[in-house]
């Protein structure tokens, strides 16, 4: 019975997630005396896709700037500060920046690794920042951040109209 449950997944990542959850449950029941065989579900290899390098990063960033200034700032923070766009950048507040805007301090509750991070901000990124109220989001200029799919949606729209971005390229 348990072997058939994950077979509905064609995506290897989804299969491995379901397999991991099932293994925990089945192995717990087995260890606590239930008449059930230990799980023998094996992991599936996840497919890796290699993105093509971007030859003209400055040209692409200029094109992004003309398309959407929020997306441009997000791309700069992703590319130059190595922040993650969908959580770390989208939820940035001015209080996360130092007074001189030279560093961004992120607490462990705001980052995937759960570790505190202090990230330097290059001069060309600082020149685009206009400091606002400490409790305000850097994109919305209000207390609420953009919705969680905002940058994904804007990036998808940009990819459709971009003249420089090729298939399998991303920042």
Regions found by a protein language model. Name each.
Residues 55, 61, 107, 122, ...:
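Residue-level detector of conserved, well-ordered beta-strand and adjacent loop positions
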Residues 91-129:
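Conserved tyrosine-mediated DNA breakage-rejoining catalytic core shared by Y-recombinases
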Residues 122-169:
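Active-site/catalytic core of tyrosine-dependent DNA strand-transfer enzymes
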Residues 12-16, 31, 36, 40-86, ...:
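Basic, Lys/Arg- and aromatic-enriched nucleic-acid-binding interface segment
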Residues 3, 23, 27, 58-65, ...:
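Amphipathic, well-packed alpha-helical segments that form the structural scaffold of globular domains
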Residues 4, 59, 105, 137-138, ...:
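Conserved beta-strand positions that form and line the central face of beta-propeller blades
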Residues 1-27, 66-69, 145-150, 167-170:
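N-terminal core-binding DNA-recognition domain of tyrosine site-specific recombinases/integrases
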Residues 3, 62, 90-91, 99:
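Phosphate-coordinating loops and pocket residues in cytosolic domains that bind phosphorylated ligands
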């Amino acid at each position: 019975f348990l072997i058939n449950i994950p077979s509905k997944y064609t995506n290897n990542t989804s299969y491995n997630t379901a397999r991991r959850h099932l293994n925990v449950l089945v192995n717990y029941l087995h260890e606590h005396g239930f008449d059930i065989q230990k799980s023998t579900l094996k992991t599936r290899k996840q497919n890796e896709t290699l993105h093509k390098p971007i030859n003209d990063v400055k040209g692409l960033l200029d094109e992004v700037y003309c398309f959407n200034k929020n997306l441009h700032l997000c791309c700069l923070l992703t590319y130059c500060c190595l922040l993650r766009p969908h959580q770390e950048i989208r939820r940035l507040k001015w209080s996360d920046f130092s007074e001189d805007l030279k560093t961004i301090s992120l607490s462990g509750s705001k980052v995937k690794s759960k570790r505190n991070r202090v990230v330097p901000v290059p001069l060309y990124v600082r020149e685009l920042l206009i400091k606002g109220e400490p409790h305000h989001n850097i994109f919305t200029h209000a207390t609420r951040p953009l919705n969680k799919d905002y940058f994904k949606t804007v990036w998808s729209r940009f990819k459709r109209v971009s003249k420089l971005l090729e298939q399998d390229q991303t920042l």
